[in-house]
Structure formats: structure tokens, C-alpha cells
Amino acid sequence: MVRIAINGFGRIGRLVLRVALSRSNIEVVAVNDPFITTDYAAYMFKYDSTHGRYAGEVTHDDKHIIIDGKKIAVHQERDPANLPWGSENIDIAIDSTGVFKELDTAQKHIDAGAKKVVITAPSSTAPMFVVGVNEDKYTSDLKIVSNASCTTNCLAPLAKVIDEAFGIEEGLMTTVHSLTATQKTVDGPSHKDWRGGRTASGNIIPSSTGAAKAVGKVLPQLQGKLTGMAFRVPTVDVSVVDLTVKLQKETTYDEIKKVIKQASEGKLKGVLGYTEDAVVSSDFLGDSRSSIFDASAGIQLSPKFVKLVSWYDNEYGYSTRVVDLVEHVAKN
């Protein structure tokens, strides 16, 4: 049984808890968030505007949230170094704050007594792993790892399949991305990203993303071959990647579909999906896969130039991969 703790009880932290509770080999021991009390933690876990009410029983006492009779300690520490991970015998701390995402800051969990750390955000210093793509490169000496971003988790499996079959010369990615907590409900100050300060619910907002470049970190053969940008749009969840690539080998769109379908039914089953249905974004709410290729949405201009479209639940799919990575780290 792997004993885990979750630091940061936001969108990803709460969904990671939902997913972890469904795994028989994981015990969630504690959550930490300096901004919430146990009664509020129970409320936020029980009710979810996007993914619906939790199906089980959720209560609380002064020091715990109690889910289906299972007590989970709630801490309110701002500094992870002060958390009781040692006395609670935590195997893996999951940091979903978006704050402690580099090796030096995530080290605070190790200093507090956790054996290992999984960061639920891209990191410029911690090694990044995408389940289905490069988790086999993980070695037990790595104490702190990153699960990359939701968009990298969508793009990387698709890029891996295409590159292995046809070779990617170069490519541009656009993610049409649902709004997130970093955006504003009305126009407000956002000094680093002026456009990002505009009303989230009423605008399509161009934004930067490192997701495509990060693919080069998990698939070194694609280093320098991909870059991308984002449009933030007024949907609450589910996003879609548009990958436009120049291939090394000539092919047909039917052959591309065949290769992706085979991968989705084989080694990438559960990570990469495939559909030919006339789907829209809400059809993927709660989908646990990282990337669902939309065969009827893509187009081909010439034998080496194609546009590929793949959907992802940027909350639930990503949270599922976080727990998958935790399991992989624990076993290896």
C-alpha cells in the first residue's frame, strides 16, 4: 500500500484525491492547504460544478475530512518543510499547488519526511514524465519528478506515434484550452500577461504555452522540432490540441488513422483514444484518457503535411495520469 499526501487542494488536488480513492493500492493519508478548514475541504470535495457531486459519503471533524468512513488528515501549513510527512510515513507527496514545482522548492517535502515527490505541473528543473511516453526512463534514484502539463500529456502520445511511424520534420501546435483558475472573472491586473487579465468568460484569449517545447524533454528526438501557442476559451473543462506537422515520409490520412487506432488499442490503450464520431468538447468531460484522436476532424494537404486533432479533459485526464505516475514511481 502506497501512502500519499496531497499538497494543494485546488482543481487538480481534489480530482487526484477522487482518482486515488478508486485505486486499491493507494492510501491517501493527508491533504494540506493553508487556505481551507476541514468543513470547507469536505464541501469542496463533495460538490464539483464540472464533474458532479461525489457519489459516496463526505463528512469531517476538527482535523480530518472523512470520505466513505476513511479519515484523511487536513493540515494548514504554508511551508511544506513544516509538514509531518515523516511521522505520517508518507511514501509520495503530490504537490498540486503550482508553487513548489522546481527541485529546490519541492525538496521541502523530502525535508519534511516524504520519500518522493510528484509535481503536478511542468518544471524547468525536475525531470518530466508522461505516462505512455517516457515513464520507462524513470529510475529509483529520482526523488522528485514532474507529471508535465495536461497539454503535454495530450500532445506527447500523439507525437510519439506519428514520429515513430512517419517521422516528424517539424510542427506547430495550438491548444484551444478551457479556462483555468489563473484567469480573471472580470478584467483585472495581470502584469506579466496583459491579455490574460481580460474576462475569461467573455473572450477568446491568445496565450503562450510551453507544452509543445516540453515534448522535446520527454521525447528527445523531437527537441527543437515543435512549438506552440494557446487560445483560452470560455468553456469550464475539456481542451483540444491541433497539431500541424510536416512529415518525413509520404503517407495518406487513412494510413495515419490506422496507425493511431492501432496504438490506441495496443500499447497506449487507456492513454491514447480514437474516435470517428461527430464529437464536441462536452463529450469528453470525465474522460480518463490523456489524448483522444478525432479522426473526422483532421485534414491533409499533401502527402507530408497534415493537421491532427486530439481532445483531452485537462482536469480529469491529467489527474488520472498523476495517480498513474505515482503508482509507477512507487513500484520502481
Curated annotation (Swiss-Prot):
CDD domains cross-referenced by the UniProt entry: GAPDH_I_C, GAPDH_I_N
Catalysis: reaction(s): D-glyceraldehyde 3-phosphate + phosphate + NAD(+) = (2R)-3-phospho-glyceroyl phosphate + NADH + H(+)
The keyword Oxidoreductase appears for this protein: yes
Annotated GO biological process: glucose metabolic process; glycolytic process
Keywords: Cytoplasm, Glycolysis, NAD, Oxidoreductase
Pfam families in alphabetical order: Gp_dh_C, Gp_dh_N
Site feature (Activates thiol group during catalysis) residues: H177
Recorded superkingdom: Eukaryota
EC number, as in UniProt: 1.2.1.12
Localization of this protein: Cytoplasm
This protein's name: Glyceraldehyde-3-phosphate dehydrogenase 2
Source organism of the structure: Candida glabrata (strain ATCC 2001 / BCRC 20586 / JCM 3761 / NBRC 0622 / NRRL Y-65 / CBS 138) (Yeast)
